[in-house]
């Protein structure tokens, strides 16, 4: 059975995560405040960010940068800036 939460990112009730996807206190906050749809949007941006900036997840500084971008995107409403990327026009 799915959980319904108020998603901080989408600013509406939505289906919550099935389990905690990220460790620690931040993971608990994501579990309680971020919907599956919002998390999927983040994963898409995260993939683009890792590829375009050539981030190495074995590098602690790169992981910290990615975590900061995640918090900014999910909780502060800031979009991820990827140099040279222009979003498609939605018709």
From Swiss-Prot:
Keyword presence, Iron: yes
Top-rank taxon: Bacteria
Pfam families referenced in this protein's UniProt entry, alphabetically: Iron_traffic (PF04362)
Any one of the GO BP annotations: cellular response to oxidative stress
InterPro entries named among the record's database cross-references: Fe_traffick_prot_YggX (IPR007457), Fe_traffick_prot_YggX_sf (IPR036766)
Residue ranges crossing the lipid bilayer per the database entry: none
Protein's UniProt keywords contain Iron: yes
Swiss-Prot/TrEMBL keywords: Iron
Cellular-component GO terms for this entry: cytosol
GO molecular function annotations of the record: iron ion binding
Stored HAMAP family: Fe_traffic_YggX
Function field: Could be a mediator in iron transactions between iron acquisition and iron-requiring processes, such as synthesis and/or repair of Fe-S clusters in biosynthetic enzymes. Necessary to maintain high levels of aconitase under oxidative stress.
Family: Belongs to the Fe(2+)-trafficking protein family.
Protein name: Probable Fe(2+)-trafficking protein
Species for this entry: Salmonella typhimurium (strain LT2 / SGSC1412 / ATCC 700720)
Annotated gene: yggX
């Amino acid at each position: 059975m799915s959980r319904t939460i108020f998603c901080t990112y989408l600013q509406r009730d939505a289906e919550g995560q099935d389990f905690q996807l990220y460790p620690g206190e931040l993971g608990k906050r994501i579990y309680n405040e971020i919907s599956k749809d919002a998390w999927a949007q983040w994963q898409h941006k995260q993939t683009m960010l890792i590829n375009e900036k050539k981030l190495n997840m074995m590098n602690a500084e790169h992981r910290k940068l990615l975590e900061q971008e995640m918090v900014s995107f999910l909780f502060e409403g800031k979009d991820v800036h990827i140099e040279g990327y222009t979003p498609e026009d939605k018709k």
